[in-house]
Amino acid sequence: MYTLARQLLFKLSPETAHELTIDLLGAGGRLGLNGLLCHRPASLPVRVMGLDFPNPVGLAAGLDKNGDAIDGLAQLGFGFVEIGTVTPRPQPGNPRPRLFRLPQAEAIVNRMGFNNLGVDHLLARVQAARYSGVLGINIGKNFDTPVERAVDDYLICLDKVYPHASYVTVNVSSPNTPGLRSLQFGDSLRQLLEALRQRQEELAGRHGRRVPLAIKIAPDMSDEETAQVARALLDTGMDAVIATNTTLGREGVEGLAHAGEAGGLSGAPVREKSTHAVRVLAGELGGRLPIVAVGGITEGRHAAEKIAAGASLVQIYTGFVYKGPALIREAVEAIAALRGERPVGTH
């Protein structure tokens, strides 16, 4: 069924198809229909960050930026759903066109620029949703906030989303907000992490529960830079790392239509680079901090490869665009086979 749906959606511009998909998933979620349209994965429970996941395959941030289809996405069988990136104030993002398909490579180039309706709108959608599973909320800074004041935006968002999130992801790795990636390095990173950690402790006391903080990093750092990030995460008491965001590289798509468009490349071509980052992180972290792996999972075995590389959880987005909900089940089954476990029933 998804093959036909994809053929129809791919006749539309990528962003129009994206918007229509969110609308349809949202409507299906409200009616409880989405779970009837696909074979949901069996249960493969895992506990990470102190949270219980029904399976280790989640939706990466970026598909549902405003929380408009939380119930609909959950009904497809994701073990967890991450929404956003959201900023303190609404912003339109970069001019269109800003989203490009590279179907020959099962890839997408985007330069969306954190387009979203703001954190208050997102929280209204979260409160309207019936979903009671693991919900991640991905936070960022507004385009017009100077990088040296970025911490202010992250703290505003953290304050607001904290009571409603299962975990919070701090996005310092989008290539489409000028200067943002500089926050991944040196003193800038440590100052941001220390401010977030201090606020997390204050909020935990206020709300009576500790919401884990994850940091999402880029795949374009050297091994030593990635190792330095890992050490900073340990030193400042972060709870998880998500590896990775999109790449500025164009390896594997040279000569394809839209390959030269500015923006971050996701999908199959980023797979090896992202998995390599997971291996580097795993070597440095030594099991002291969980890794959520994302990047280039277009088949179930790719999810298992990332678990084997050291990840505890995986996320999909571009692969979901190309393969549909069946990829969730394939990934769960591949991870179960890797672990020598048998998934139980359906959830």
UniProtKB/Swiss-Prot annotation:
Pfam family, one: DHO_dh
Membrane topology per record: Peripheral membrane protein
Record keywords, A-Z: Cell membrane, Flavoprotein, FMN, Membrane, Oxidoreductase, Pyrimidine biosynthesis
Any one cellular-component term (Gene Ontology): cytoplasm
CDD domains for the chain: DHOD_2_like
Localization per record: Cell membrane
EC number: 1.3.5.2
Binding sites annotated in the UniProt record for FMN: 61-65, 85, 138, 171, 216, 244, 267, 296, 317-318
Annotated GO biological process: 'de novo' pyrimidine nucleobase biosynthetic process; 'de novo' UMP biosynthetic process
Active site: residue positions: 174 (nucleophile)
Cofactor: FMN
SUPFAM superfamilies: FMN-linked oxidoreductases (SSF51395)
Pathway: Pyrimidine metabolism; UMP biosynthesis via de novo pathway; orotate from (S)-dihydroorotate (quinone route): step 1/1
Positions that bind substrate: 65, 110-114, 171, 176, 245-246
Catalytic reaction(s) noted: (S)-dihydroorotate + a quinone = orotate + a quinol
Function per UniProt: Catalyzes the conversion of dihydroorotate to orotate with quinone as electron acceptor.
Assembly, per entry: Monomer.
Assigned protein family: Belongs to the dihydroorotate dehydrogenase family. Type 2 subfamily.
Protein name: Dihydroorotate dehydrogenase (quinone)
Organism of provenance: Azotobacter vinelandii (strain DJ / ATCC BAA-1303)
